């Protein structure tokens, strides 16, 4: 069997990726989230497939079909809530994964990092079109508001929006195409994940110390397969507590009301994992400016490899940048909270300050801290 897994064309790929992969011996539990994201993706594809068997992408029956899944299909309620809350777990793992990449300087593996940004954007697109499918009030109005932002693009904006809608408003054509997008995008994500892993295995994993670990590596199996299994069990435990005890805690009550184009909800807001970007969008009074800020809030991550001027890898031995990093995390939490609040004083002001802070920390304060730390190092050596 040993010879077969090392020589067989297909098994050799699996062997080099998950069994005999040389891995740094010092990587901590923060490195577990890559495998957890893989588990989340597989789970979302499987639960989504079973939901798609019973769902109808028609404005007249979409809401009823979701109700039918929950009431009449065997364990349909479980599949539906696993899928909905699985998306939340997916984003929690993804945000931690990106946060770990920033903290430990993993962005210096620039190809892997850039594919990761594409993955984040694709996942956000998938989650957005998926949220429209139950055809509740928040589904309909969320789709209307967010797609309408494209009309801010000069000259072609209005035409583009009508092209995406398939008409002059969000209607049957929109729902059908969003279902098609929601079905195909996870497979595109899977392809990008393979490219992400391909680039990662070209360079090897980073590690908490930020030093070269070529001299101290261990095989991935059994050491990290067991460690990842513990992470998977903890993830599933949290997910099952969420699904079985608090299935609607992360959802919006408005989505239990069928979509009605004549009645606007009091507060239109997306799912919690988009609230930070939504807060940045809302904090700019100009429509086009808001859209650009929304896109840049994710694309700004691509600047990390370019503006990094530190002599050290990661933030482990950089106390000034560490403080700035944790202010950045706190700022993100504030943005998420503000995104869910109504558009009125003081929330608008807090949102604007937090949005300025978000970009300033990445573009100004972190590079400045790196330069100060480099100077301190020069004084010592």
Swiss-Prot record:
CDD domains: cytochrome_b_C (cd00290), Cytochrome_b_N (cd00284)
GO biological process: mitochondrial electron transport, ubiquinol to cytochrome c
Keyword Protein biosynthesis listed: no
Entry's cofactor comment: Binds 2 heme b groups non-covalently.
Record-level GO cellular component terms: mitochondrial inner membrane; respiratory chain complex III
One of the Pfam families matching this protein, by short name: Cytochrome_B
Quaternary structure note: The cytochrome bc1 complex contains 11 subunits: 3 respiratory subunits (MT-CYB, CYC1 and UQCRFS1), 2 core proteins (UQCRC1 and UQCRC2) and 6 low-molecular weight proteins (UQCRH/QCR6, UQCRB/QCR7, UQCRQ/QCR8, UQCR10/QCR9, UQCR11/QCR10 and a cleavage product of UQCRFS1). This cytochrome bc1 complex then forms a dimer.
Task performed by this protein: Component of the ubiquinol-cytochrome c reductase complex (complex III or cytochrome b-c1 complex) that is part of the mitochondrial respiratory chain. The b-c1 complex mediates electron transfer from ubiquinol to cytochrome c. Contributes to the generation of a proton gradient across the mitochondrial membrane that is then used for ATP synthesis.
Name listed for the protein in its UniProt record: Cytochrome b
Highest classification ranks of the organism: Eukaryota, Metazoa, Chordata, Craniata, Vertebrata
Chain's gene name: MT-CYB
